[in-house]
Amino acid sequence: MNQRKSELIPSFSRPPSRVLIRKVARYEEDLLAIIHESLTEFRLQMKDKTVLLKPNLVGLDPLGVMNTHPAVIGATRESFLKMGAARVLIGDGPAMDRDTEAILESVRLREFTGKLGRDFCDLNIDDVERVELKTRASRLKELFLPKTVLGADFFVSMPKLKTHHWAGVTLAMKNLFGIVPGSCYGWPKNVLHWAGIGNSILDINAAARPDFVIVDGILGMEGNGPIQGTAKAAGVLLFGDDMVAADATACRVMGLRPEKIDYLAKAGTMLGHLEAGKIQQLGEPVAAVRTEFGVVKEFQHLRV
């Protein structure tokens, strides 16, 4: 079984990260072909691996604005299976609506994935293991994390492209709040809020680093996100092999400056690449897809 470790890697010692942007106007497009072609660009070796997809499933969302769209999740799962993965799990631990089954029905996930059975894991109630934190960015000294996350061979963060009224943005890194079980940390993951949102984001991502990122930006959310914002069509899917680089690029797509987001700036020194010059840009250039996202007044300083 793979066991994820908390790791800090100085920025200067890492090779350039890769981020790929695809224009995708509607969820009705051939997402399987688009996603499979995009994943192939990264030459991922998936044979016989157990993959965990971690979408952003926040709450009841029949309009598809709040959560990662099920069409993206389903096509991604099928693509990894085509690439030779032995098993592709889907898991999340929603923070707001505690009825995970009701959320799955609301977003119509099984219409795009078929019956999942044990291939879906409610991370709020999964068995946990203790992970000692090396970062100690927050007040926490340790985290109790789901065994499903720690045991995955390949872990994919699949956020929605959204602003956040407390964190500025919620993307691949903030999405990992959903792996921290509510059974241990309360709802809506209150212990993490008390420990400091930004610093908790750093600790979680160091303890359970995603191997890959796929951002659903076909339809995002601006303003008072992550729940009460307004739908914003950005028309993109974003892929990356570094969660910091992916989040930084997603911010630039949104017309926001990632270096002004405190936790992202810190992450750029120890977890991944923040600077555009250290990110190999594939597919569409940021300038071709930039869509200005509105933010709450506390984060107006993020705007380019």
Per-region residue spans from a language model:
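N-terminal and secondary-structure boundary signal
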Residues: M1-V304
